[in-house]
Swiss-Prot record:
This is Large ribosomal subunit protein bL25. Part of the 50S ribosomal subunit; part of the 5S rRNA/L5/L18/L25 subcomplex. Contacts the 5S rRNA. Binds to the 5S rRNA independently of L5 and L18. HAMAP family: Ribosomal_bL25_CTC. Keywords: Ribonucleoprotein, Ribosomal protein, RNA-binding, rRNA-binding. It comes from the Bacteria. InterPro entries: Rbsml_bL25/Gln-tRNA_synth_N, Ribosomal_bL25/Gln-tRNA_synth, Ribosomal_bL25_b-dom, Ribosomal_bL25_C, Ribosomal_bL25_long, Ribosomal_L25_dom, Ribosomal_uL5_bac-type. Belongs to the bacterial ribosomal protein bL25 family. CTC subfamily. One of its GO terms (molecular function) is structural constituent of ribosome. The gene is rplY. It comes from Aliarcobacter butzleri (strain RM4018). This is one of the proteins that binds to the 5S RNA in the ribosome where it forms part of the central protuberance.
Amino acid sequence: MLEGIIRDSMTKQATKTLRREGYLIANIYGKGLENVAAAFKKNEFIKFLRNKETLAFDVKLGGNVLKVVVKEYQKCPLTSELLHVDLMVAQAGVRTSYSIPVKAVGTAKGLKNKGLLMVHTRRIPVKSTIENLPNEIVLDVTNLDTGDNILIRDIQFPANVDCYLDPRVPVVGVIKAK
């Protein structure tokens, strides 16, 4: 479980001080809940996110435990350092928008014919409850030849998970290398 602190002051100076001390600024929000300004140790947060197994994870703030999902993050354009993260509270039984990562598995046939595997869509936006949400969408690309694509309409989503992308959007494909 990831532990953080609730920020008391919202001034620019207080934010700079927290960042200098190694904290990551966060905003936690949810449907029907009051926004919470928080801060997490940056290194702990990054290590925790790399090792988590599900989209939703628990954070502890001032004695309260919240189940949250990373909704958005900001990086410094020069150093690519993580500056800010928005966390949304994942409430049971409430349909919300999430972005599910795509994972391509296998070696495509087209790669033997000097093709390149292109992942066009790294995350697929869906609407679902947190209970029905898959951790990732695994696509088997072994049968893809040069010029073949896997489209949104080719993916079998779990029950009660609705994708709101156009069905003709390519997710993974093999293109001919030049």
